[in-house]
Amino acid sequence: VAVADLNAAGAAAVATEVQAAAPACQVFAQPVDVADAAAVQGLADEATRRFGQVDIFCSNAGIILRKGLEASADDWQRIWEINVMAHIHAARAVLPQMLERGDGYFVNTVSAAGLLSQIGSAPYAVTKHAAIGFAEWLSITYGDRGIKVSCICPQGVQTNMLFGEKGERKGFLQEGSVTAEHVAAVTLEGVADERFLILPHPEVLEYYRRKGQDYDRWLRGMRRLHDKVMQEFGGIAV
């Protein structure tokens, strides 16, 4: 197992936990900025050097900007590099070796926002749709050559992104949110079944069906939800 994080201490701590839980497992940690293609390639190269190959690449990093049209060009570029380009960097780094042996798996953390939308954050909604689009393309293009792809698409997950580092943040997705452990368990099941969409909140599938069945009705419903959220939580409501 290779553990990567922008925070070197955080990556090392997770690696230590993995090693304690599975003493026979080979583990290493490496600080990586996933927005940096060379850094992602370096991670893949080091994992390949240590382990011989990369079987599964879990592309998990993501950020949110609670902005709409006021988001600057720099804001858009930053979230694009992390929420979209990180997945592309991962594919570029390990797809060649996967294709050579005819087997490999990309597990990309995306969001239900990539299937639906995100009230309160235009950059998040747009980049998560793009992340789904890239994963679909990857599966369509290489699925018959042994490459498997899964997208994890939860709604609220009980992490610092949702609650803030000190639990100070309030938002409509906190109700009904699930633990990271729940997401992990559902993800393991989804990967075992080789499902493209992994939905820790099963109701998201029904929301997605309704969107496809009657887009205009879905948009009207989302506008009502938007108004309700803004009244209850104000402008920063994610």
Stretches found by the model and what they are:
Residues 1-13:
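Conserved glycine-rich Rossmann-like NAD(P)H-binding loop of the short-chain dehydrogenase/reductase
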Residues 8-9, 31-42, 73:
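The beta1-alpha1 cofactor-binding region of Rossmann-like NAD(H)/NADP(H)-dependent oxidoreductases
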Residues 21-26, 46-57, 65:
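A glycine-rich helix->loop->beta "capping" turn
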Residues 63-77, 120-123:
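Conserved mid-core segment of classical short-chain dehydrogenase/reductases
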Residues 111:
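Residue(s) in the substrate-gating loop at a strand-loop-helix junction
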Residues 140-203:
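SDR active-site lid
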